[in-house]
């Protein structure tokens, strides 16, 4: 898994101002004439995901304005990691969001930055570099950001892996690795054992494959705790029987195990 695009600190980090569209005029009117003129010239309106680079006199980036729209779009910062010039950035101001909600907004910015930076680079000789990184905002719930980002990245990696490298055995191995990391227990029911355990449908779908079908059963948590069961479809490549699907229907069948990937994530 690639490292998250979040760093501890950088004295030279470029400040980010996040602002809602309804507060933009008030904020702009309080700025210097040069700032007002630049915002007017670029047409920055504060809509969700909009970016405006604020220049220094020497042409380098002094700061960045980021639109939040009405403030309800959790993913407004999702394109920053891939749209901003190379460098380190820090969250400086959140304008137009109530104080009680600013910590939540900062948390969503950090998570959106992580998800926006994602690239599937398993088959690249040189993994994608992180051009724009964010200093951890003080207000964020780090545990939530790291957990949610790593979960989403795992899910994406499993789905993006082509079927030749993501068969039933590979998906089961991913589940076992996750179980080892988090203290869960995995039970695999493989091949003809599916019939004796009363899973005939799973057996029927995968019995002709070179790699035997299997049921992955992962259990985590205290035995006496309330039970929540998540079920995800894990067909690693659905050919529609004996390859009866047209090419347009076959193209994306590597993601037919996306339900299982989401459960693991």
Regions found by a protein language model. Name each.
Residues 175, 227-228, 243-265:
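Alpha-helical metal-binding/catalytic segments enriched in His/Glu/Asp
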Residues 1-235:
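N-terminal hydrophobic/helix-forming segments and targeting peptides
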């Amino acid at each position: 898994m690639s490292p998250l695009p979040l760093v501890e600190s950088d004295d030279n980090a470029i400040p980010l101002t996040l602002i809602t569209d309804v507060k933009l005029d008030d904020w702009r009117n309080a700025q210097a004439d040069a700032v007002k003129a630049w915002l007017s010239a670029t047409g920055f309106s504060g809509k969700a995901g909009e970016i405006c680079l604020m220049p220094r006199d020497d042409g380098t980036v002094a700061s960045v304005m980021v639109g939040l729209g009405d403030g309800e779009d959790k993913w407004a910062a999702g394109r920053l990691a891939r749209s901003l010039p190379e460098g380190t950035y820090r969250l400086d101001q959140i304008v137009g969001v109530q104080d009680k909600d600013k910590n939540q907004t900062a948390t969503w910015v950090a998570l959106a930055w992580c998800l926006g930076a994602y690239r599937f680079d398993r088959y690249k000789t040189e993994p994608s570099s992180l051009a724009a990184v964010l200093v951890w905002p003080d207000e964020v719930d780090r545990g939530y950001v790291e957990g949610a980002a790593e979960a989403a990245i795992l899910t994406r990696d499993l789905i993006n892996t082509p079927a030749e490298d993501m068969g039933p055995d590979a998906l089961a191995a991913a589940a076992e690795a996750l179980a080892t990391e988090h203290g869960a227990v995995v039970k695999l029911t493989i091949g003809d054992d599916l019939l004796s355990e009363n899973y005939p449908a799973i057996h029927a779908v995968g019995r002709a494959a070179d790699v035997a079908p299997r049921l992955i059963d992962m259990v985590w948590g205290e035995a006496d705790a309330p039970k929540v069961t998540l079920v995800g479809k894990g067909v690693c490549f659905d050919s529609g029987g004996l390859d009866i699907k047209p090419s347009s229907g076959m193209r994306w069948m590597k993601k037919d195990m996306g339900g299982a990937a989401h459960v693991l994530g």
